[in-house]
Amino acid sequence: MQNDIKTERLILHEMTAADWAEYVAHVTEADELFVQYGIEPDERLIEFIKEPTIGVLYRSIALRDTGETVGYIGVYEEEDNLEFYVFREYRRRHYCSEEVGAFIKAYLSGVLTGTLHDRVIAETLWENGPAAEMLKRVGFVSDAVGFKLSENRENNITGTWRLKYE
């Protein structure tokens, strides 16, 4: 398929409605919504994520050898803001760093959009330190530390790291 991104173990292909439904099924499992969005899940959030966000260029991540979906990656092109998610059962296998590295190279070079981009921004919750460390391994640098108001398990403020790749 046009604009597929291939790595040694993965294929990042255009996301289908079935791929998005699989993501929703995984992320609505216990504790996954908090990890992904930083807020306690409720019916409004679950309803909100049933449709992909408008303006985000999504790719589904599949294993090259089996075609099995392991997560997704996307970028909100207007802000060059990266988002990604690997299903729980596929974590700690370095799929995330493999997908992020390949995706940002394709995005920055214009392969995905026909437009060159000069940066990618990623934000992650303090509670998700492994994501920040992975982003640093693929070349992101810390850009800012902040807070966002949300319903955290302990209080109403969640810390965030903002990282940048140029």
What are these regions (language model features)?
Residues 1-34, 58-166:
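Acyl-donor (CoA/ACP) binding surface of acyl/acetyltransferases
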Residues 28-50:
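Conserved GNAT-fold acetyl-CoA-binding loop/helix
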